[in-house]
Amino acid sequence: MEIVAENRKARFDYFVLQEYDAGMVLVGSEVKSLRQRKVNMGDAYVLEKDMELWIHNLHISEYNRADRKNHKPLRVRKLLLRKREIHKIAGNIKVSGLAVVPLMIFFNNKGIAKIKIAIVKGKKLYDKREAIKTRDWQREKSRISRREV
């Protein structure tokens, strides 16, 4: 598995409740841009329309060697999942306080571009502060243990 991009801010801003791997409907120049890691998914989110999942604000830069048939960087892309997974996710989207955001884009062992999406719940400010405290404490513990050895 080759990781192309990771949305680390999503793990900081949200509690991840459930994760899914989904395929994406892409054109050739988008796949080539993904291989060059020219993607930004900081503001991306997933919406349901007509029992299909669509990802919005996923910026895949234009492939510089493509001609006039190049793709639009911010176009809405369809996600490919099993029907029962789509029903579960769509039901969770309708629950207030829950959202679906992308966590990472990767190429699987067969070389197919996939996206890991998650059902998330927003963190409060004090939860974020607690996460920062624990992260800093883990970092400090590792520094102390390296000095003692």
From Swiss-Prot:
CC annotations in GO: cytosol
Keywords from the named record: Cytoplasm, RNA-binding
Gene Ontology biological-process entries: trans-translation
Keyword Methyltransferase: no
InterPro entries: SmpB, SsrA-bd_prot, SsrA-bd_prot_CS
Matching Pfam families: SmpB (PF01668)
Signal peptide: none
UniProt-annotated location(s): Cytoplasm
Recorded family membership: Belongs to the SmpB family.
Protein name: SsrA-binding protein
Originating species: Anaplasma marginale (strain St. Maries)
The gene coding this protein: smpB
